[in-house]
Amino acid sequence: MKDKFELVSKYSPQGDQPRAIEQLVAGLKKGLKHQTLLGATGTGKTFTVSNVIQEVNKPTLVMAHNKTLAGQLYSEFKEFFPNNAVEYFVSYYDYYQPEAYVPQSDTYIEKDASINDEIDKLRHSATAALFERRDVIIIASVSCIYGLGSPVEYGEMLVSLRVGMEISRDQLLRKLVDIQYDRNDIDFQRGRFRVRGDVVEIFPASRDEHCMRIEFFGDEIERIREVDALTGEIIGDREHVSIFPASHFVTRPDIMKKAIVNIKAELEDRLKVLRAENKLLEAQRLEQRTNYDIEMMEEMGYCSGIENYSRHLSLRPAGVTPYTLLDYFPDDFQIVIDESHVTMPQIRGMFNGDQARKQMLVDHGFRLPSALDNRPLRLEEFEKHINQIMFISATPGPYELEKNPDVIEQIIRPTGLLDPIVEIRPIQGQIDDLMDEINDRVEKNERVLITTLTKKMSEDLTNYLKEAGVKVQYLHSEVKTLERIEIIRDLRLGVYDVIVGINLLREGIDLPEVSLVAILDADKEGFLRSERSLIQTMGRAARNENGRVIMYADKMTDSMRNSISETERRRKIQIEYNEKHGITPKTIRKEIRGIIAATSAADEREAIKQHDLSKMSKKERDIFIEGMEHEMKEAAKALDFERAAELRDALLEIKAEG
């Protein structure tokens, strides 16, 4: 079992980083439960945390408040720890409409979701890694505090295979069906197996390229091979392989029988209550739906919405804390909360929203009361899972400061870059003034972020700038995660010079090309113009040597005064450090890269151009083309015709080139 973290970087800690690393490590070794790193934007907080992880050498959960930020962190940690298990665990829904009931209009809304297969694979990879090794960093969104199947069941149900092991082919097939693998000899993909005589090929749920070929001689495993699932090329021989379940809600047949008995008993009790209250329609509905689910579980081992029975499937009493990803970690793991001033309030609020919706379903006979136990953790339950935790933020919130008021500061940037200069200008004539500033930045090949207070103002401003010939895009809450990453990436590439948004430009977006942040209506007090929000927004201009913030306001609010004062305090410390060490601030141009396959915004043709086909052998070229053709067919099958057409055109170009 590999258990040592190995940080790979051409950089060594600079500026404030060595002191911050030393203090955090000392605190962890001393047994401090809560620590807070106040790290200004662009000071290399991820690098600092990476050094701490290497030094302390414990499995680590890094939590972010949205998929975009989690994707960026995943990419960065993957670069720092190429030889360790860096995993990604976020909600696997591209689209999610939760089950709900609106009594006023008697409207039942069925659960509707689109699952992202790539993210599902990464989730399985994350939990499998925790069973196989200790050098694991999992980057997760707050969805990791939602209910997951029992880690005990998950671990006990894994199928462990060794060369020389006595097991018949049919016994193996039954075991695979028990852990929710499907047999499919034609359409072979993740979570499936196929059989050819004495050879069984298994496609693990945590992989998307390599499968395992198990060769039998009688009732004994003669050979285990790792094989490229697409080409059939042998990757290598294996002495041992663990096949993890294809679902996190997997249950042993004996436990399933007990669970069904308990579900039937709960149904009987609930029907008595509903009939006593003269809710006959609700009783009939609940009986019909639950009996259908029970039949499915008896026949297939699972049903749609099986997570609503998770309490019974793990044989837990009512009200007990549900299993989550946190239960899959060993006891000595550590948690890092990124952008904690946003993430902690999210953790606090998730339980209440979930319960309000589910209670309505229970009251009207759509679900049994036990469905209420398939839920996210309460804050106090989350706190019980904490062994040691580090809060990371440029603006720590009240929760973090209450837990440990001794904040560790990281103000100096290794690049020598300073916090931006802040100017206040009158609201009168702000758009004309802004146009001049945009034109000035465009000439220098720099980018601009503009933050407004309302959707209407964002739309109007975007349209006005477009008519004036500015390459501008509006980033709003209805933009999907993948499109959002694409827009941010396009800003860096110069497809756009300006992005207009409301509350979407603050935390953790790394944009060194941005030299101007314009804050409209800066004097309108509220959560979008609070001291913490303003400091975060200003920080978007701190990665460029020409960074500047313009606040358009007619009066000075306390939030403006405090945020400007804090920025000036940091700027003073940074200038003194630079003068003492002879550092000249210089913008660091980071490589513009995709984040993960599931959230990459790269254009297909650009991606294909990166493969120098002229240097490939005929066999390599044929394999590459075959892979693209497979991808094109999969895209068409998924009704993603635009992507399929792009791949088709690229294939035609490649074939035309000979």
Curated annotation (Swiss-Prot):
Gene3D superfamilies xref list: 6.10.140.240, P-loop containing nucleotide triphosphate hydrolases, UVR domain
Record-annotated UVR domain positions: 622-658
Stretch forming the signal peptide: none
Protein keywords: ATP-binding, Cytoplasm, DNA damage, DNA excision, DNA repair, Excision nuclease, Nucleotide-binding, SOS response
InterPro entries recorded: Helicase/UvrB_N, Helicase_ATP-bd, Helicase_C-like, P-loop_NTPase, UVR_dom, UVR_dom_sf, UvrB, UvrB_inter
Major site of localization recorded for this protein: cytoplasm
Domain Helicase ATP-binding stretches: 26-414
Compartment annotation: Cytoplasm
Binding site for ATP: G39, A40, T41, G42, T43, G44, K45, T46
Pfam families per the UniProt record, alphabetical: Helicase_C (PF00271), ResIII (PF04851), UVR (PF02151), UvrB (PF12344), UvrB_inter (PF17757)
Domain of life: Bacteria
Helicase C-terminal domain segment(s): 430-592
Transmembrane region(s): none
Keyword DNA repair set for record: yes
Motif (Beta-hairpin): 92-115
GO function terms (MF aspect): ATP binding; ATP hydrolysis activity; DNA binding; excinuclease ABC activity
UniProt GO cellular component terms: cytoplasm; excinuclease repair complex
Recorded domain comment: The beta-hairpin motif is involved in DNA binding.
Stored HAMAP family: UvrB
Subunit structure: Forms a heterotetramer with UvrA during the search for lesions. Interacts with UvrC in an incision complex.
Physiological role: The UvrABC repair system catalyzes the recognition and processing of DNA lesions. A damage recognition complex composed of 2 UvrA and 2 UvrB subunits scans DNA for abnormalities. Upon binding of the UvrA(2)B(2) complex to a putative damaged site, the DNA wraps around one UvrB monomer. DNA wrap is dependent on ATP binding by UvrB and probably causes local melting of the DNA helix, facilitating insertion of UvrB beta-hairpin between the DNA strands. Then UvrB probes one DNA strand for the presence of a lesion.
Family assignment from sequence similarity: Belongs to the UvrB family.
Descriptive protein name: UvrABC system protein B
Species lineage: Bacteria, Bacillati, Bacillota, Bacilli, Bacillales
Encoding gene per record: uvrB
